[in-house]
């Protein structure tokens, strides 16, 4: 298939600039795999579509406030780093601005001067390896103090509260972007879901900025996916196996949870406790081996994420649903409304 097959026209005013308030007041488009029907609901209505014995799998990764502004030493020139991933120990891969002026050996101080770093190496893609002279725990404390959330480029409004870009169950620091399908959940909604006999299990996948990288190739199978680190605990793996064995549904909350489960199922033939890196690319024609349903947001045209949704729900039906979403003025992208496929 071609990249252009996944294009749709989206009015700019439908790109959400802030989350729904309260979170579960977002709209929910419900797509039935049984009869192809489309229903228009509110996210807090989600429990009506869940059955006792179902298992929701959420991504508990937490976004690092990883965008930090500093000054070069000794010139005092302003610069910016965005921490992308931990390479080893105190060394991180970073996006640097202005990159050309931050050559190896450049020293930078941040905040009140207690956070310092030095550029070690420039990579082929222009990113930098940077060493921070702190252990990981101390660095995270400094980022909490000085850092800003690395919001997607299509969100131009500043957050009133940085917690707006975290899920209520986020706990494992490491993402450069939020697993946004989970932003719609509130503690009260999760309690309601559990009270219905529906389980909630956690996996971890640290979302990289590659999630925003556009597909450049015309033929989608020529696209090379970015790699992201994931982890599945023994408890979660066992709950998923038991759910499947009992004939109940495993519903992924977000494309990151989906990619984690499908990567492990494809690699091992079952869900097992493990961790590693995945660059799995799910597009029409690729078979799913674990999930039975998906909760997700409305994604960018020609993105790998709309391709993933098309792989699960079907290309024609997915593009038709997006057309309806535009007509019905759903809110799109990270802070937008949600879709449930069951």
Give short role names for the model-derived ranges.
Residues 1-342:
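Surface-exposed, charge/polar-rich loops and edge strands
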């Amino acid at each position: 298939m071609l990249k252009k097959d996944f294009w749709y026209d989206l009015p700019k005013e439908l790109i959400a600039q802030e989350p729904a308030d309260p979170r579960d007041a977002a709209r929910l488009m419900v797509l039935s795999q049984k009869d192809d029907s489309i229903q228009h609901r509110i996210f807090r209505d989600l429990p009506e579509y869940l059955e006792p014995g179902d298992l929701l799998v959420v991504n508990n990764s937490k976004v690092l406030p990883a965008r930090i502004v500093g000054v070069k030493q000794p010139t005092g020139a302003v610069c910016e780093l965005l921490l992308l991933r931990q390479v080893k120990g105190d060394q991180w891969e970073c996006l640097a601005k202005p990159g050309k002026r931050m050559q190896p050996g450049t020293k930078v101080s941040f905040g009140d001067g207690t956070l310092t770093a030095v550029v070690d190496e420039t990579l082929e893609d222009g990113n930098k390896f940077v060493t921070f002279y702190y252990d990981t725990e101390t660095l995270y404390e400094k980022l909490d103090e000085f850092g800003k959330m690395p919001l997607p480029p299509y969100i131009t409004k500043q957050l009133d509260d940085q917690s707006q870009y975290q899920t209520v169950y986020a706990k494992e620091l490491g993402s450069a972007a939020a697993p946004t399908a989970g932003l719609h959940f509130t503690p009260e909604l999760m309690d309601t879901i559990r009270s219905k006999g529906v389980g909630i299990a956690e996996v971890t996948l640290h979302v990289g900025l590659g999630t925003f990288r556009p597909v450049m190739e015309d033929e989608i199978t020529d696209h090379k996916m970015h790699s992201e680190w994931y982890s599945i605990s023994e408890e979660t793996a066992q709950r998923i196996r038991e759910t499947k064995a009992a004939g109940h549904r495993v519903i992924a909350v977000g494309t990151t949870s989906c990619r984690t489960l499908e990567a492990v199922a494809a690699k091992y033939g079952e869900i097992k406790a493990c961790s590693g890196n995945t660059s799995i690319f799910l597009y029409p024609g690729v078979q799913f081996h674990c999930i039975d349903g998906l909760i997700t947001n409305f994604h960018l045209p020609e993105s790998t994420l709309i391709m993933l949704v098309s792989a699960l729900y079907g290309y024609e039906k997915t593009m038709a649903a997006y057309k309806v979403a535009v007509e019905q003025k759903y809110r799109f992208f990270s802070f937008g409304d949600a879709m449930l496929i069951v």
